[in-house]
């Protein structure tokens, strides 16, 4: 599903609505992870699917009349993992998964490590979190904050312009 289009994911956590609306295109596929649909209802957006254990979805009957609702009740995976396991896309733009609680932030790091075949960008307030490709180059304005956190064995050959060098990391 969606294997040719980028997909927007909405979780139950805090969503910077202004940031989301700047990026979201009305014809883009959108999937709510469980109660993420509650955010979309306030914006009058109907997701293509709602996937999760549905423990935080408000008014399930309303949604069942509007879109496909997939209930996966197992507690061995998070709602985000349930969504990723049931969708395929070139890129995912994910809102509402990080920031509210530290364990949720750790969980997205786990997801980035576990789902290496998925290209996911998490939007968390002023931060974006994503797994770097094998080769990456970026030019940023001076004083831009950037953090590099290895999730697997990695090697940075060279860095340039950083306050603290990470060469040969």
How does the language model describe each region?
Residues 1-3, 22-25, 63, 87, ...:
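Solvent-exposed alpha-helices and their adjacent loops that cap or buttress functional pockets
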Residues 1-14:
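N-terminal nucleotide-binding beta1-loop-alpha1 segment
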Residues 5-7, 25-30, 46-48:
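Short active-site oxyanion
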Residues 13-21, 25, 31-33, 37-39:
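Metabolite-binding pocket within alpha/beta catalytic cores that recognizes anionic/polar moieties
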Residues 19-21, 104-108, 132-135, 159-161:
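A short secondary-structure junction signal
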Residues 23, 35-119, 123:
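Acidic/Gly/His-enriched mid-domain segments of enzyme catalytic cores or analogous surface patches
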Residues 122-134:
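Short, flexible loop segments at boundaries between secondary-structure elements
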Residues 132-169:
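Long, charged alpha-helical interface segments
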């Amino acid at each position: 599903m969606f294997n040719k289009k980028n997909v927007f994911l909405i979780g139950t956590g805090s969503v910077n609505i202004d940031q989301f609306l700047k990026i979201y295109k009305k014809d883009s596929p959108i999937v709510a992870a469980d109660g993420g649909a509650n955010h979309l209802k306030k914006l009058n957006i109907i997701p293509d699917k709602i996937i999760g254990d549905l423990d935080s979805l408000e008014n399930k009957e309303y949604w069942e009349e509007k879109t496909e609702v997939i209930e996966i009740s197992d507690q061995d995976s998070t709602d985000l993992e349930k969504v990723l396991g049931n969708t395929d896309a070139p890129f995912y733009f994910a809102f509402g998964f990080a920031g509210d609680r530290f364990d949720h932030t750790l969980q997205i790091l786990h997801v980035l490590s576990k789902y290496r075949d998925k290209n996911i960008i998490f939007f968390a307030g002023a931060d974006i979190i994503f797994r770097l490709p094998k080769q990456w180059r970026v030019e940023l304005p001076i004083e831009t904050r950037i953090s590099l956190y290895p999730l697997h064995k990695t090697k940075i050959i060279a860095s340039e312009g950083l306050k603290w060098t990470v060469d040969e990391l």
